[in-house]
């Protein structure tokens, strides 16, 4: 273990934790050096399980020989481990750390839509979902409630943003996911790609002609893509028009909509049944 006590907040090797934005970590100009931040021992462990490559750790000093010991034993011995008391770490990062531990990791190469959909029966499609907290919650529900993959439009939030990874409890590393490619952009290109792969599409939207989510037609589909829209406006009208089904969640007490993360959990539970 290459243990390094933090003595200089301005050290360039700490930029990844203290000064680089999420967009800078993505590093689209040099994707081979793109990074993400995993937060908490559980999330870091799940990232390692998925084969993600660690670059460095930042943690409370007390965790080096405590909660982090098993994680560090799984990493090469020359991985830098930056350590300090919790108050110093929070002053450095500018946010409250969950479980006092961060790990900078290489961003994995994303698979193709065809690869993540191979053998899949149920996939979630996220159209322009912008809030990382919602992204993380949707991934957690997708992994728990029988979705086989998650597909995202390019305009949505990144599932590897620190907050999304943390809220997902590391399930972003447990369920296959990717973006629709530039040569098949969402919605028209992505919809055509899903059809070529044998999927029917179900738009989650409140329309007069919507099917109830418990309609037997939906469960009878061998391959179904469940399409969820952005916060506030929901799915674009053009997206709904291109889908095979429009589906609603029945609601009581005059409530007219659910948060996209809550709606996803209901949809995945009902439509993900075997």
Per-segment meaning from a language model:
Residues 1-70, 156-157:
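Boundary-proximal intrinsically disordered activation/regulatory segments immediately upstream
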Residues 3-10, 80-85, 176-187:
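Short acidic-hydrophobic, aromatic-tinged amphipathic segments that line or gate anion-handling sites
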Residues 66-78, 239:
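Short, aromatic/basic amphipathic alpha-helical patches
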Residues 73-96:
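Glycine/small-residue-rich loop that forms an oxyanion/phosphate-binding "nest" at active or ligand-binding sites
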Residues 101-103, 141-145, 156-173, 237-274:
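Structured adenosyl-cofactor binding patch, chiefly the S-adenosyl-L-methionine
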Residues 108-209:
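RNA substrate-binding interface of SAM-dependent RNA methyltransferases
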Residues 202-255:
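Active-site/ligand-binding-proximal alpha/beta "capping" segment
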